[in-house]
Amino acid sequence: MAKHKLSKGQQRRVRENHQRRLKKQDNKPEMDDNQLGEPQEGLVISRFGQHADVEAEDGSTQRCNIRRTIRSLVTGDRVVWRPSLQTQADVKVNGIVEAVHERTSVLTRPDYYDGIKPIAANIDQIVIVSAILPELSLNIIDRYLVACETLGIEPLIVLNKIDLLDEESRAWVNEIMSTYHNIGYRVLKLSSHTGEGMEELTKMLAGRITIFAGQSGVGKSSLLNTLLPEDEEEILVNQVSDVSGLGQHTTTASRLYHFPHGGDVIDSPGVREFGLWHLTSEQVTQGFVEFRDYLGGCKFRDCKHRDDPACALRKAVEDNEINQERFENYHRILDSMDQIKPRKTFTDNDS
């Protein structure tokens, strides 16, 4: 059934009601200083509207209000919070977040209408999970790598389900993955079913905050259920996010989980995909790390690296210095960006 478009009058009333709700929220009194204990360090485990779950220094999780002066708060933020000395009658709140430490990185999601939204903070690495089944898509891997380069977050390419490969197929996969290894990316081949490669993955996760990304069906849930404690496995059966946008998600808030052997993972269902359509063509070009040595070497400054004469990138492809399929995926990404025009112009201030 088609949805009726709201009239201008209905749209105005929706906006007015929204503003009234915001004003009502703003009029709610915050906790007085005499109701609060001493400042403590904490880690945001999850964010729910005007509240956040904060992990205290003793390992306990405390539901906290958020100071109105805090402009942005997301899962993974390191904060200063103060415990409540009194319990509010209407909401079980144990404290208030007073300040947010400077972030080392921020994972953002481009929104078609509202600009760039922060989803998680202080991410150390993004694990790009792929598999030979349902399909080994190098185009999707390359899209994730461009996103990682733009965000400044280190990627780790993980090829799952290698137990399904025979000797000949393994040789073929090794040749494909060598392309990424040769340009400086970490590549790990494993099987969450047989356990092959899992010990090495555990070591690479230790001491770091990680996001798992990958198209539907590559085994992200199986990997996380193998890595996480049993009491958190059931949570992730339905909660693990599909960052590729090719599958469904059921959770509404990002959440941080601890690996028993060290390190953390943030499940971010708010990110269906690493949308690239908000990037400039120059940012996408810079996202292909092996291109960088050749940029500026083209005959024309506005070279599109297609049929332009004396193109340094195309010459590098012809000389086998740049992988042909990576070069083709680069143009596929640019072509896909031209098909989507956001309602909002993106600026650095959006993040």
From Swiss-Prot:
Basic and acidic residues compositional bias, start-end: 13-31
Main localization category: cytoplasm
GO molecular function: GTP binding; GTPase activity; metal ion binding; rRNA binding
Taxonomy, superkingdom: Bacteria
Biological processes annotated in GO: ribosomal small subunit biogenesis
Top enzyme class: hydrolase
Residue positions binding Zn(2+): 298, 303, 305, 311
Sequence ranges assigned to domain CP-type G in this UniProt record: 112-274
Any single GO CC term annotated in Swiss-Prot or TrEMBL for this entry: cytoplasm
Free-text remark on how the cofactor is bound: Binds 1 zinc ion per subunit.
Protease as UniProt keyword: no
Pfam family, one: RsgA_GTPase
Protein EC: 3.6.1.-
Residues involved in GTP binding: 160-163, 214-222
Keywords: Cytoplasm, GTP-binding, Hydrolase, Metal-binding, Nucleotide-binding, Ribosome biogenesis, RNA-binding, rRNA-binding, Zinc
Cofactor needs: Zn(2+)
Gene3D superfamilies named in the record: Nucleic acid-binding proteins, P-loop containing nucleotide triphosphate hydrolases, Probable gtpase engc, domain 3
Matching InterPro entries: G_CP_dom, NA-bd_OB-fold, P-loop_NTPase, Ribosome_biogen_GTPase_RsgA, RsgA_GTPase_dom
Stretches for region Disordered: 1-37
Annotated compartments: Cytoplasm
Protein task: One of several proteins that assist in the late maturation steps of the functional core of the 30S ribosomal subunit. Helps release RbfA from mature subunits. May play a role in the assembly of ribosomal proteins into the subunit. Circularly permuted GTPase that catalyzes slow GTP hydrolysis, GTPase activity is stimulated by the 30S ribosomal subunit.
Complexes and interactors: Monomer. Associates with 30S ribosomal subunit, binds 16S rRNA.
Family: Belongs to the TRAFAC class YlqF/YawG GTPase family. RsgA subfamily.
Protein name, entry field: Small ribosomal subunit biogenesis GTPase RsgA
